[in-house]
Structures are given as C-alpha cells and as structure tokens.
Design a protein with these regions (language model features):
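Structure-specific DNA junction-binding interface
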Residues: 5
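Conserved acidic residues
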Residues: 146, 187, 558
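Hydrophobic helix-and-loop "lid/oligomerization" segment in the mid-to-C-terminal part
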Residues: 2, 10-147, 167-168, 219-447, ...
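Histidine/acidic-residue-rich, glycine-tolerant segments that coordinate divalent metal ions
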Residues: 150-205
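Histidine-centered active-site/metal-ligand motif
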Residues: 176-177, 375, 434, 525
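Mid-to-C-terminal polyanion-binding domains and interfaces
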Residues: 75-79, 323-329, 335-369, 402, ...
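Short alpha-helices
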Residues: 99, 182-225, 234-246
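Acidic-glycine-rich active-site phosphate/pyrophosphate-binding loop
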Residues: 74-75, 181-191, 530-535
C-alpha cells in the first residue's frame, strides 16, 4: 500500500512553547515537541498529562437524566427489587455488564440486612441480534425483574423499551452510540451524545457510561461511608473500563485517558481472577501488560465468545473469583478465538476473491460484499481487513433469517460512514453505530439498490485524499535523538490510541550499517540495521523484504517508524517498528 507522509510542523508560537517546556522540564527538544503536538502549553499541563488523576473526572450529575437514573436505582435497592443488567455481546457490552454487576454485587454485600437480587442478560448474536431484544424483555418478565439497566445498547430501542414498559418493567439506558430522532421512553436515558446533554466529555465507551452511573450512585449515597475519596472504592472497576476503551476504539483523551491509565495499573497490580487467567493464556508477562495487549490479545479473545458462541461466557469469566473455573473458562475462550481466526481468515480470502472478480470494483469508491454462508461473528473483522487492503468505506454482509441480511461497516480516516448509511435508511430494517463503525440489516431484495445508493453517496462526499492512508508524522529525528531518556518520555505519554496516537517519526538518508536482510519463514520481512554515518539503530519492517537489496546496495532511504523496546538475552535496546520505507528524497512538513 502507498502512503501519504504528512510531517507535522510547529508554528512559531508552538516553537516558543517547545523551548519553554524543554527548559522548565529539563527534557530534550524532541521530547518537548511530543508534548506540544498533544496541545500541551505549560509545564503544569505536561505534569497533569503524564500523571492522570481521578480528581479530574467530571461530575457524573452533569449527564442528562443522571439524577433520575440514580434515584430509580436507589429505589430498586432499598425496596429489594430484582434488577436485570443487559449488555451487548462485544467487549464493551460484556465489560459493562461485569462492571455494573460487580458494583451492585459489592453494594448488596455491604447493605445487610437490605437485599436485592441481580441477574444479567447477553443477547444471542444469531437468534436475537444486536441490542435490546423481545426475548431479553420476556426473560426479565419471566424472572420477575422490575428494572432493566441496558449497557452499550438501547438508545434506538424505542419499540422494545415500550414493550418493556407494557410489562411493568422500568428501563435505565446507558449507551454511547449516536441517538436517533426519537429517544426511548425510559426512566432515564444516559448518553452524552444526546443533543440536550451538557456533559462535557462526549467520547465515553458504553462501559464508561455505566461507570458514570456507578460513580454517581457512590457520590450520592456512599460517599460518607467511603470518605475521604469515594472514587478509590471504584478503582478496581477501571480494569474493565480499560478493556472497553481499548477494544471499542474510542478516543483515549480526557476521561478515557484517565480511566484507561488507572485500569492498566489495576490489571498489572491486582487483576480480577478471570482477567488474570486470560492474561496467562494469552502469554502476557505478569505486571507488563500494555494497551496494545488489550487491543490485540485480550480484546479479541473476549470478543470471540460473542462471535463464535455466547457473550455470556465472557461475562462469566469476568465475574468469577474461582481460579480453577477461571482457568477452564479462559482456555475455552482461547479455543473460541482460534476458531474465530480460522473463520475470519477464510472469509477474508473469499471476500477478496469476490472483489477481484468484479470488473467494476476498480472504479468504485466503496466496498460492499455479501455471501449467505459467511459467519455473522466475523463480518466486522473482515470489513476491517478489506478496509486495510483497499482503503475504502467497507460493508460486509451475510444472511440471517426470513430474507434479512446483516453485517458490519468500517470507514477510512475522516469519512463518516454512519451518515453515509443513514442516507439509505429507508432500505434498512435496523442500523446503528458511529462515524467509523456501524452495524446494519436489510431485506435481501434491497441489497442491489443499497449498494448503488451507498456508492453514490460515498462518491459524492469522499475526498481523494481520504482514499489514501496517511502517516501523520510527529517529528523528524536524528538517530542521536533516540536515547533512553527520550524513550522514557514517550512511555509517559501512554496509553496510546485514537486521539493520542503512538508517535510516528521519520529519519532520513539512512544507509546500511552491517546486517540489513530479509527474514521470516518466507523471507517476506526486513530486519534493518541502518546508520546515519554517526549513530546506528536496528528495526523490523513487516512485509518489506522488497527493500532489502536496495538498501544492501548502499542506497539511502527515509524511514517512517514507531519506537519500542526489544529484549533479547536479557539485553534491552530501542528499535524501530517500521511503518514505511521510501528511497531518500526531500521531505517537507505540511
């Protein structure tokens, strides 16, 4: 894939701030630049950024309907009602259910002789689909639940919540997806994206909204028992939040940064029993978990439960305090993930073949593929893989029941796929999501018209530069800049993710040092050993063995890369994780 390189230049004012931070914090110019690029203007702001504080969390009662939600929850608690915690089957939904269940379970154990009952429900991906289902409400009625708390779903469940009301069941909605034109008639609708909600931070995960409800209840009814800082009691729950934030690809800014920071600390210091087991199965070294481990190792395993079997298995793992059961459940979850990998690999091959056989595909601005036999649990992953391959807004669909097909959508940088799908909503039976990812369903008879209208919308609204991936480079470094102290500053910028990306750097006019060569089973990767004639560094470039001979022949290259640590034989070095390599040329910042 060909990338655009966009090198960030500092304005004159930013350069002054950089110099001031360098002086006041006693850090290198390159390190100060990393802070400036993140909008940091003072030494105090820098300290607050690298040392997140729970005190910086917003008052949960700023969220519309929070007062109503807390009072209805309190009523259920003191009257001994049965509460059903209802969540989606993905990581965000299952962690949200586990968070709320743990919070209320701990509360119940401390309120003796007051008692209230808890249950939870995860819809079946295949028989019920996403969100609040009729079956779930019937389950609540059959089990005498008088209050449902929905997590990571419910914002568009107008008819389903009306159905719950008809059965005498109250509902509190905790969701973060984009609301529709009509809100459900629930006791409380907690969603910071409501047009009438003044809550200052708009990017919480579904689990994050659930946490704000727990925070609000604690603040109102438990603070006197937990003083001086009632938030400390909620600290263990942040490990579930970190998982949801990492896996749901929400911005790691503001409150999400604070919650993810403390959540990763909790996972490394005192993980829940089930999470400790899944970390062991995933091969994560104790006390060294990073947000990348959540994104690429833990999240996919938890998601695999809902994709291949049932999200309930994930919640059971997240709730258990039995180490024997946790290990058994973690092994089962791992098995589901292996099945998922095999399935998504085969489906991706079939989808790519379908596109390659389509003579019109080369001229289209969007990708829509469908096959009736594809596994519903992997269409989102396949959509992501197709987006990575062709870099176009992508929808992958498969068959359901009664002529209904459903699937997942993924977008490219800067393009709002939710709005694009919404332009075709008269053809859909259901859809929801946000700017970069969505789910949708329609009758099979509408597929052809949908493809045509979706393509027309994308073609009219997408810019040419959005059809080519861009590497947003934060700084040009000399190899002499790459020191242990500089790398230590980078580590303090973690956790990385959307809104706080892992820094990309460029170093220019590098040549072979000693041992640049192709590596890997198929000799498809490139091990770099390069120098700027003064300093040297090693690195790895996956899938770029095509550049081996060029570099070995003495030609100079420009390299775009991230930095990480590599430990071999107990010796740790800083190395490049290469994103792109091009022949040396004059580069300018944009």
């Amino acid at each position: 894939m060909t990338y655009q390189w966009n090198i960030r230049c500092l304005t004159a004012v930013e350069q002054e701030v950089q110099q001031q931070l360098e002086k006041e914090l006693n850090i290198s110019s390159a390190a100060a630049r990393m802070l400036v690029v993140r909008g940091i203007q003072t030494a105090d702001e820098a300290r607050a950024f690298v040392r997140p504080s729970l005190d910086k969390l917003h008052d949960p009662f700023l969220m519309k309907d929070m007062d109503k939600a807390v009072e209805r929850l309190h009523q259920a608690i003191i009257q001994g009602e049965k509460i059903l915690i209802y969540g989606d089957y993905d990581v965000d939904g299952t962690t949200a259910v586990a968070l709320m269940y743990r919070f209320l379970q701990d509360l119940a154990s401390s309120l003796s002789p007051l008692t209230f009952n808890l249950d939870y429900y995860i819809p079946d991906r295949y028989t019920e689909g996403y969100g609040v289902s009729t079956q779930g409400i019937d389950y609540a009625a059959e089990h005498a639940c008088s209050l449902i708390i929905t997590l990571d779903c419910g914002i568009k469940a107008v008819e389903k919540i009306a159905y719950a009301n008809s059965k005498g069941i109250d509902v509190i909605v905790c969701d973060h997806h984009t609301p529709g034109d009509e809100l459900p008639n629930a006791v409380a609708v907690l969603n910071m994206k409501r047009s009438d909600c003044p809550y200052p931070y708009k990017d919480l995960s579904g689990c994050g909204v659930g946490f704000k409800l727990a925070q609000a209840y604690t603040q109102r009814y438990l603070a006197s028992r937990l003083s001086p800082n009632s938030l400390i009691a909620l600290l263990p729950l942040t490990q579930l939040l970190a998982m949801s934030i990492a896996s749901d690809i929400v911005p790691i800014t503001g409150e999400n940064r604070i919650l993810a920071y403390f959540g990763i600390q909790q996972l490394n210091q005192a993980p829940f029993t089930g999470l400790s087991a899944i970390m062991q199965v995933a091969g994560i070294e104790a006390k060294k978990l990073t947000i990348n481990d959540l994104v690429y190792k833990i999240g996919p395993r938890i998601n695999a439960c809902g994709r291949m079997k049932s999200g309930r298995a994930a919640v059971e793992l997240l709730l258990t305090d039995d180490p024997v059961f946790a290990r058994q459940q973690a092994e089962e979850v791992n098995h589901h993930n292996e099945d998922r990998r095999d399935c998504d690999s085969e489906t991706t091959k079939e989808a790519l073949a379908q596109l390659q056989e389509d003579p019109t595909f080369a001229n289209r601005r969007s990708t829509v593929v469908y096959a009736p036999h594809w596994h519903k649990g992997v269409v989102g992953i396949v959509a992501s893989r197709l987006t990575e391959t062709y870099y176009r807004p992508t929808i992958v669909l498969t068959a359901g029941e009664d002529g209904i097909i459903s699937g997942s959508a993924r977008s490219v940088g800067g393009f709002d796929i939710y709005t694009a799908i919404d332009s075709c909503n008269d053809l859909l039976t259901n859809f929801g999501g946000h700017k970069y990812a969505a789910g949708l369903s329609m009758h099979i008879d509408n597929l052809l018209e949908f493809k045509q209208r979706f393509e027309a919308y994308v073609a009219d609204h997408i810019r040419e530069d959005q059809l080519q991936p861009t590497l947003q480079i934060e700084a040009e470094l000399q190899l002499a800049d790459i020191t242990k102290s500089f790398y230590n500053v980078l580590r303090h910028l973690e956790p990385f993710g959307p809104g706080n990306p892992r820094p990309l750097f460029v170093s220019r006019h590098l040549i072979n040092h000693r041992d640049t060569r192709a590596v890997g089973k198929e000799r498809e990767h490139l091990r770099l050993d390069v120098t700027d004639r003064v300093n040297a560094i090693t690195g790895i470039a996956f899938g770029r063995a095509d550049m081996a001979e060029y570099i070995q022949n003495g030609n100079a290259v420009d390299i775009c890369y991230e930095l990480n640590e590599n430990t071999f034989n107990h010796y740790t070095t800083i190395q490049m994780m290469v994103q792109d390599i091009i022949p040396n040329k004059k580069l300018s910042c944009c």
